[in-house]
């Protein structure tokens, strides 16, 4: 039985999204059990609206506090110790759940998850990673997407290690290619942090292909694209906004007159396939990598359909043993990186110089 703890109160909409999504998920995956974490009376009232809810697959975990979307991290972490967000992460720590999911405040979710679960050896900060569809029919793993606004070159190297480990574990790619997001491919481009990170990546055993630009994400030029959380979040929100805009424009154009309506009817199968490929809701659910447990971040604005995919991401992570495999890969790659750095720092033996 796969056990997933849900922060039912988190996100822009809270219970009106999380409870229906949990019910549909439970129906779809009978091998799963859900811990519904939040204000118990509110959860009971939300469940009562769905008479056919599989109640035997749910366990309500009572919380007395809720982390709002605008709560400062310090408040969420230090004062709201009985929040639904905190208790969802604690359920994983205590072994009551195999994974936890929240659509709440990103900064608070990262801080709480990091505090409760701790980071893997060799990792200073967790990073948010997700898959963005590309023209090859596969997907590009991009991280960080907002967990770390300010990063050092060493942090970017660690993100590359985690992204490589994730791609190996989930996409089964033996030697994933890595690119560093920059304003150009040339080595002279970028700020000092990016330049230093590129040098660290070049000296590492990772399959680093150099700097990449934003359009390379959609070309599928590399398997993993690394950037700081500020840039990554802007990229992600831009992609989502563009997808929604294109969907709206296409719909408007096909509804313009009778001829376009007929053309739309003929093109409907193609349009449906296109929508499925680019619908950002189907890619909802980003993994918070680098922790000693499976943590999934849903979009705060996710609807029921999108939140269901975040729950599926959590289930897939458990089934594929993502956390264990990522921990093993991170340990192995980190060791290789450290060995490479040690070798690079050794003085030349006498007689080797010309």
From Swiss-Prot:
Pathway: Lipid metabolism; phospholipid metabolism. It catalyses: a fatty acyl-[ACP] + phosphate = an acyl phosphate + holo-[ACP]. It comes from the Bacteria. GO terms for biological process: fatty acid biosynthetic process; phospholipid biosynthetic process. InterPro entries: FA_synthesis, Phospholipid_synth_PlsX-like. It is found in: Cytoplasm. Its main location: cytoplasm. Keywords: Cytoplasm, Lipid biosynthesis, Lipid metabolism, Phospholipid biosynthesis, Phospholipid metabolism, Transferase. The keyword Isomerase does not apply. Homodimer. Probably interacts with PlsY. This is Phosphate acyltransferase. It comes from Bordetella petrii (strain ATCC BAA-461 / DSM 12804 / CCUG 43448). The gene is plsX.
């Amino acid at each position: 039985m796969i056990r997933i703890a849900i922060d039912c109160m988190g996100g822009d909409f809270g219970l009106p999204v999380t409870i229906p999504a949990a019910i549909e998920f439970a129906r779809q995956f009978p091998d799963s059990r859900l811990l519904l974490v939040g204000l118990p009376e509110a959860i009971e009232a939300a469940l009562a609206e769905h008479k056919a809810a599989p109640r035997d697959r749910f366990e309500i975990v009572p919380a007395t506090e809720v982390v709002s979307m605008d709560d400062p991290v310090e408040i969420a972490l230090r004062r709201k110790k009985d929040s639904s967000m905190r208790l969802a992460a604690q359920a994983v720590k205590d072994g009551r759940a195999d994974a936890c999911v929240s659509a709440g405040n990103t900064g608070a979710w990262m801080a709480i998850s990091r505090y409760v679960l701790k980071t893997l050896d060799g990792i200073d900060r967790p990073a948010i990673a997700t898959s963005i569809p590309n023209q090859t029919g596969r997907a590009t793993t991009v991280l960080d997407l907002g967990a770390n606004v300010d990063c050092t070159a060493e942090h970017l190297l660690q993100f590359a290690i985690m992204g490589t480990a994730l791609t190996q574990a989930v996409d089964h790619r033996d030697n994933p290619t890595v690119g560093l997001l920059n304003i150009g491919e040339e080595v002279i481009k970028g700020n000092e942090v990016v330049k230093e990170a590129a040098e660290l990546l070049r000296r590492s055993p990772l399959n680093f292909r150099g700097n990449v630009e934003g359009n390379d994400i959609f070309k599928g030029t590399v398997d993993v694209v690394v950037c700081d959380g500020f840039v990554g979040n802007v990229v992600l929100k831009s992609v989502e906004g563009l997808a929604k805009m294109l969907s709206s424009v296409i719909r408007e154009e096909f509804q313009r007159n009778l001829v376009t309506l007929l053309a739309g009817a003929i093109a409907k199968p193609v349009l449906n396939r296109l929508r499925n490929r680019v619908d950002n809701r189907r890619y909802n659910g980003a993994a918070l990598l680098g922790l000693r447990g499976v943590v999934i971040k849903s979009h705060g604005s996710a609807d029921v359909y999108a939140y269901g995919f975040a729950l599926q991401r959590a289930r897939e992570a458990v089934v594929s043993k993502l956390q264990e495999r990522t921990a093993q890969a991170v340990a192995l790659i980190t060791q290789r990186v450290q060995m490479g750095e040690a070798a690079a720092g050794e003085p030349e033996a006498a007689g080797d110089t010309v």
